[in-house]
A protein has these predicted regions:
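Glycine- and Gly-Pro-enriched alpha-helical subdomains that act as flexible
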Residues: 177-199, 205
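Conserved alpha/beta cores of soluble small-molecule-handling proteins
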Residues: 1-170, 174-175, 204, 213-277
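Secondary-structure junction motif
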Residues: 208-209
Length: 277
């Protein structure tokens, strides 16, 4: 069952207007969330990020965040996931519009919520990662800070990584600094300091990234947000990537160089597990 514009419908009966700007122009936003035993983790944070992005793009929210939260829970229940581990996606588009780029004067946004059972990938060995060569993050673009529907660079990067036998692409920005993973934020222990690309480097302000930075304070782990060169990443003592579904995934190889699963990664993974509902 899909939640579409105010009601639950069977997936095969969920119809989107062919003139929807999300389909035609990627004019919209999305959030990916994880539920543990039916409890959606960091739901308010995800909805706040979506609301902030919608305000930035002048896309009206068809419902207030508490009502969207209710719809999320309804979607879980309708898919028999009210007590299960699940992955959810909330998609917001500007809705249908006339031909051309300019948005309609009175948009009728489309809101879609979907849910499916989630089974985490095996994490005992960690991810193999490679630097993406064909796609980059534009650190100067407004959309680099927003979780927009325009994910083609990420698709290209992840396709390239898969072709190389890797699990995750590491994307650089236009200044050859590390920005993020194809579907993740990147952290590395460099010269004894846990370091992550600053938002200004083209990193998405991830919900899990924010949680890790907060955990570093409570765990008294020194952390820095700054530009990271590819050469620095190659010499890192530890690397891990984060997102809402993966949580903290250690990296066992970057561009052919093997890495151990380090103490900082294990410590933060343990602390993060304590945050789960």
């Amino acid at each position: 069952m899909i939640w579409l514009n105010g009601r639950l419908v069977a997936r095969e009966q969920a119809h989107i207007d062919p003139a929807d700007r999300g389909l035609l122009l990627a004019d919209g936003l999305f959030e990916t969330l994880r539920a543990y035993r039916g409890h959606v983790f960091k739901l308010e944070d995800h909805l706040q990020r979506m609301a902030a992005g919608a305000a930035e793009l002048a896309i009206p929210l068809p419902l207030d965040p508490p009502s969207i939260a209710d719809a999320v829970r309804e979607t879980l229940a309708a898919n028999q996931l009210a007590a299960a581990d699940a992955a959810l996606r909330i998609t917001l588009t500007r809705g249908p519009g006339q031909r051309g780029l300019l948005p309609p004067d009175d948009p009728l946004p489309t809101l879609i919520i979907s849910a499916a059972a989630y089974h985490p990938p095996p994490s005992s060995d960690g991810f193999v990662t490679v630097t993406a060569k064909r796609a980059r993050r534009n650190e100067k673009s407004l959309t680099a800070r927003l979780k927009t529907l325009c994910y083609l660079d990420n698709v290209i990067a992840q396709t390239e990584a898969e072709a190389a036998g890797a699990d995750e692409a590491i994307m650089l920005n236009n200044r050859d600094a590390v920005a993020c993973g194809g579907r993740s934020n990147v952290f590395a222990v460099i010269d004894g300091v846990l370091t992550t690309p600053a938002i200004e480097e083209g990193a998405l302000p991830g919900i899990t990234r924010h949680a890790i930075l907060a955990l570093c304070k409570s765990e008294r782990i020194e952390v820095a947000e700054r530009a990271i060169t590819r050469a620095e990443l190659r010499k890192a003592a530890e690397i891990f990537v984060t997102n809402s579904l993966l949580e903290i995934m250690s990296v066992r190889q970057f561009d052919g160089a093997d890495l151990p699963a380090g103490a900082v990664t294990r410590r933060l993974a343990g602390a993060y597990s304590g945050l789960r509902p």
